[in-house]
């Protein structure tokens, strides 16, 4: 039976788990990307995404609710001033988990967890893909007339012989 399996306990007491998730969420908000295990990243994603959604509405009550979970004034101010402005039009999915392999010491699955809108590499790749698609379409239109010209010249050469 699945009793007491609603979320991953991570081998910790409730107080230790809530303190750890609070500290990890503050680090994620401040640094925009952290390295951790996959299990902790999944637990952190469930913890931090509702807080980011709450930060879209900048009211005294929402600040108090977020502060009760984070317990860090700097993280709360950064969340409400910078991050909430950048993700205002996004309907959810504010974090991304990227697996990086296993840790050498204990073979634990490691990953990055990052805020989606703060990764410059992903934004550059999207622009590059659009540029390559337009080039390909131009090459095919230019290549088609060039292929027709040699085909018409070859029969003329054969008829002359």
Curated annotation (Swiss-Prot):
Keyword Ribonucleoprotein: yes
GO cellular component, one term: cytosolic large ribosomal subunit
Compositional bias ranges of the Basic residues kind: 129-138
Pfam family, one: Ribosomal_L17
Record-linked InterPro entries: Ribosomal_bL17, Ribosomal_bL17_CS, Ribosomal_bL17_sf
Coiled coil: none
Listed Low complexity bias regions: 142-152
Annotated stretches, region: Disordered: 126-161
Keyword vocabulary terms for this entry: Ribonucleoprotein, Ribosomal protein
GO BP annotations, alphabetical order: translation
A GO molecular function held by the record: structural constituent of ribosome
Record note on quaternary structure: Part of the 50S ribosomal subunit. Contacts protein L32.
Protein family membership: Belongs to the bacterial ribosomal protein bL17 family.
Name of the featured protein: Large ribosomal subunit protein bL17
Native species: Bacteroides fragilis (strain ATCC 25285 / DSM 2151 / CCUG 4856 / JCM 11019 / LMG 10263 / NCTC 9343 / Onslow / VPI 2553 / EN-2)
Gene that specifies this protein: rplQ
């Amino acid at each position: 039976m699945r009793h007491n399996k609603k979320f991953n306990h991570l081998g910790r007491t409730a107080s230790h788990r809530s303190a750890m998730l609070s500290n990890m969420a503050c680090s994620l908000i401040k640094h925009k990307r952290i390295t951790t295990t996959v299990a902790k990243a999944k637990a952190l994603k469930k913890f931090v995404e509702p807080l980011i959604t709450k930060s879209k509405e900048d009211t005294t009550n929402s600040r108090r609710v977020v502060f009760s979970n984070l317990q860090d004034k700097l993280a709360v101010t950064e969340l409400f001033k910078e991050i909430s402005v950048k993700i205002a039009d996004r309907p959810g999915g504010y974090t991304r988990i990227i697996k990086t392999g296993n840790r050498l010491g204990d073979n634990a699955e490691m990953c990055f967890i990052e805020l989606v809108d703060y990764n410059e590499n992903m934004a550059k790749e999207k622009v590059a893909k659009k540029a390559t698609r337009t080039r390909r379409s131009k090459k095919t239109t230019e290549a088609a007339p060039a292929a027709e010209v040699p085909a018409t010249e070859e029969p003329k050469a054969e008829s002359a012989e």
